[in-house]
Regions:
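Pocket-lining segment of extracytoplasmic ligand-binding domains
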Residues: 67, 71, 79-201
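Short beta-strand and adjacent tight-turn residues that come in two discontinuous sequence segments
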Residues: 13-15, 139-140
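Pocket-flanking alpha-helical
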Residues: 1-13, 20-31, 125, 145-151
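Hydrophobic, aliphatic-enriched repeat segments that assemble into extended interaction scaffolds
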Residues: 1-2, 51-53, 134-137
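An extracytoplasmic/periplasmic, membrane-proximal ligand-sensing/linker region
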Residues: 104, 199-252
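Extracytoplasmic/secreted proteins, especially bacterial periplasmic and envelope-associated proteins
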Residues: 5-8, 96, 100, 122-125, ...
Length: 252
């Protein structure tokens, strides 16, 4: 959102890329089931998404069954559910799920839902609430299930190799935690220039873009930019960040 905030004075020329996922479908049903388990082996991408998940609670299963049958959920369906969300400043955990609601349900927001549990302790808490069936819906970056796949089925008195506490479920997270909504892309970091400077000619901008792309495609460049977790750069345009501008409106 930083570029969107200052885009009156700056011009984006590049977007950082990251390793993408095997799935980028906008159809939530395409994300569900063991056969559709997401892998971290996709192409380089300039954005990531947030996903809205139905938990294995009795009502969460009802929501998942509707989506997997090709039905569109109504506002009443969603409003009946208990949601766990992250802080209001979280892009994947609050802002973009709010935008998803606004776009699909006549401007309704998370703040309009009847049953919302705000979480201050991160996504791990959301997944533990889901596993315990304490809530019906959680929201998280795509695809958070990768990071909790092992701990989901571990006994609660054990930890996985990354230190995550077991959640005691018996079925695969891919079968039990179903995607019911997919947000628009949340764009990555930018390389931007000042609109005020007279030095940025089209020729110089082209040269800068190619320079960054060439550098990061070397081993030395990867090492330099690893501090920012950037693995590549792609040429960007201002309209890529329209969603980020809409997000600013949500939190303003």
């Amino acid at each position: 959102g930083t570029y969107a905030l200052y885009s009156d004075d700056t011009e984006v020329i590049l977007t950082a890329t990251r390793n993408g996922l095997s799935n980028d479908s906008e159809n939530p049903a395409d994300w569900n089931g063991e056969a559709n388990a997401t892998k971290k082996d996709g192409p380089q991408v300039t954005y990531y998404r947030s996903l809205i998940y139905a938990t294995p609670s009795p009502y969460g299963k009802e929501l998942a069954a509707k989506v997997n049958a090709g039905e569109k959920l109504t506002w009443e369906d969603l409003d009946k559910a208990t949601w766990a969300v992250q802080k209001t400043s979280s892009s994947a955990g609050y802002i973009y799920p709010t935008l998803w609601l606004m776009e699909n349900y006549d401007g309704k927001k998370i703040s309009d839902l009847s049953n919302v549990v705000p979480l201050d302790s991160g996504y791990g808490t959301a997944f533990s609430y889901a596993a315990a069936e304490q809530v019906d819906i959680i929201v998280c970056y795509a695809d958070g299930r990768n990071d909790y796949e092992a701990s989901w089925t571990l006994p609660v008195d054990q930890k996985d190799e990354t230190g995550k506490q077991g959640m005691g479920r018996s079925e695969s997270i891919w079968n039990e935690l179903n995607v019911i909504g997919v947000t628009d892309g949340i764009y990555n970091d930018t390389v931007a220039i000042s609109k005020e400077s007279p030095y940025y000619t089209p020729e110089l901008i082209d040269a800068l873009q190619q320079c960054f792309i060439n550098i990061i495609n070397t081993d030395e460049g990867q090492a330099i930019f690893s501090v920012y977790s950037h693995t590549g750069y792609a040429i960007a345009k201002d309209s890529d960040y329209d969603g980020a501008r809409a997000a600013l409106e949500v939190v303003s």
